[in-house]
């Protein structure tokens, strides 16, 4: 078989497989498990951000394909590899239901040792984040997405950690981004994946 054909086949296989490195050159998480869209009651994301749609959202440990019953519908956790530094929920799930909705994104982060780092993130619109089941971030207003809008010091423990984001969209874009920094630079000695160990 010609080398170019082999390369093309391999590139297709790799493109469809979640990468274990999981982050881009700037450290932004590119591989996630995503669950969406979940309809919210009313039009206030500031109120709905505190609603636990999963009955234990802080401590979820999903696997790809795992189904969840939410608001009378069955949704499955789907692997999502972003095409840019941010998750675009509308790109993932289409625009048929992209306003007044909530979504979750999960990344598994493996650290070689305990380390204190900075979690830099942003959401459009409202957002919450948990690391290993502990709340580390909340934003309850509307906004557009920018890199590193919010920063919080967190501790990654040796082994696999879990980052859970919840993002609510009222109207227009529905996005989020996150990365881990140390002294302002991306943390390089961690592995990020959408696969639970």
Residue ranges and their predicted role:
Residues 4-15:
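Bacterial N-terminal signal peptides
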Residues 18-87, 165-197:
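Accessory carbohydrate-binding/adhesion or oligomerization-edge regions at the termini
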Residues 92-103, 140-145:
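Extracellular beta-rich ligand/substrate-recognition surface
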Residues 101-103, 113, 123, 146-148:
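Residues that act as N-cap/strand-start positions at coil-to-secondary-structure junctions
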Residues 105-117, 153-158:
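Extracellular and analogous surface-interaction loops
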Residues 111, 116-130, 163:
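Aromatic-lined ligand-binding clefts that engage carbohydrates, nucleic acids, or primary amines
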Residues 128-179:
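Beta-strand-rich ligand-recognition modules
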């Amino acid at each position: 078989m010609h080398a170019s054909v082999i390369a093309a086949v391999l590139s297709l296989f790799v493109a469809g497989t979640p990468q274990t490195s999981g982050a881009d050159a700037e450290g932004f998480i590119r591989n996630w498990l995503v669950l969406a869209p979940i309809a919210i009651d009313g039009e206030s994301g500031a109120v709905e951000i505190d609603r636990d749609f999963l009955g234990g959202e802080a401590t979820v440990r999903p696997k790809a394909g795992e189904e969840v019953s939410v608001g009378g519908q069955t949704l499955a956790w789907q692997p999502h590899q972003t095409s840019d530094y941010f998750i675009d929920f509308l790109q993932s799930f289409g625009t048929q239901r992209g306003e007044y909705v909530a979504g979750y994104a999960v990344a598994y982060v493996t650290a070689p040792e305990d380390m204190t780092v900075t979690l830099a993130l942003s959401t459009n619109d409202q957002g919450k984040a948990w690391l290993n089941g502990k709340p580390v971030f909340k934003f309850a207003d509307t906004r557009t997405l920018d890199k590193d809008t919010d920063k919080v010091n967190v501790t990654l423990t040796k082994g696999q950690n879990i980052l859970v984001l919840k993002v609510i969209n009222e109207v227009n874009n529905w996005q989020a981004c996150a990365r881990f920094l140390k002294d302002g630079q991306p943390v390089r000695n961690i592995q990020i994946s959408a696969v639970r160990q």
